[in-house]
C-alpha cells in the first residue's frame, strides 16, 4: 500500500500510521509531511523500524528549505517517481 503523508508529523497521529505499516508498503511525504523525513525527527525512527520504504517529494523539500536536513533513510523523488509509486500500488491511503 502507498501512504501519502501531507500533514506535519505534529498534526497527525504517527503512532496509528506506524501500526498500519507492513513490509512492502511505501510512505511518501508530501507538502508539510516532508517534515517527518528530517534527520533526528522523533517519528522517523518508528517509521524506519516498520520496514516500509520512505520517500519525500523533492519539490516540497526545496520549497521549505530542507534540502540538507533530510535523513539518508528517506529517498528524495520527483513527480515522475511519484506517479510510478501510484502505479505500483493499487491501494493508497492519504494522511
UniProtKB/Swiss-Prot annotation:
<dbReference type="GO" id="GO:0002143">
    <property type="term" value="P:tRNA wobble position uridine thiolation"/>
</dbReference>
<protein>
    <recommendedName>
        <fullName>Protein TusB</fullName>
    </recommendedName>
</protein>
<dbReference type="InterPro" id="IPR023526">
    <property type="entry name" value="Sulphur_relay_TusB"/>
</dbReference>
<dbReference type="InterPro" id="IPR007215">
    <property type="entry name" value="Sulphur_relay_TusB/DsrH"/>
</dbReference>
<keyword id="KW-0963">Cytoplasm</keyword>
<comment type="function">
    <text>Part of a sulfur-relay system required for 2-thiolation of 5-methylaminomethyl-2-thiouridine (mnm(5)s(2)U) at tRNA wobble positions.</text>
</comment>
<keyword id="KW-0819">tRNA processing</keyword>
<dbReference type="InterPro" id="IPR027396">
    <property type="entry name" value="DsrEFH-like"/>
</dbReference>
<comment type="similarity">
    <text>Belongs to the DsrH/TusB family.</text>
</comment>
<dbReference type="Pfam" id="PF04077">
    <property type="entry name" value="DsrH"/>
</dbReference>
<dbReference type="GO" id="GO:1990228">
    <property type="term" value="C:sulfurtransferase complex"/>
</dbReference>
<comment type="subunit">
    <text>Heterohexamer, formed by a dimer of trimers. The hexameric TusBCD complex contains 2 copies each of TusB, TusC and TusD. The TusBCD complex interacts with TusE.</text>
</comment>
Amino acid at each position: 500500500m502507498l501512504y501519502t503523508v501531507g500533514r506535519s508529523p505534529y498534526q497527525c497521529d504517527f503512532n496509528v500510521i506506524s501500526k498500519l505499516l507492513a513490509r512492502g508498503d511505501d510512505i511518501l511525504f508530501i507538502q508539510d509531511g516532508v517534515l517527518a523525513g528530517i534527520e533526528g525527527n522523533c517519528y522517523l525512527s518508528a517509521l524506519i523500524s516498520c520496514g516500509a520504504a520512505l520517500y519525500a517529494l523533492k519539490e516540497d523539500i526545496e520549497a521549505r528549505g530542507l534540502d540538507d536536513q533530510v535523513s539518508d533513510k528517506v529517498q528524495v523523488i520527483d513527480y515522475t517517481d511519484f506517479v510510478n509509486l501510484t502505479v505500483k500500488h493499487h491501494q493508497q491511503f492519504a494522511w
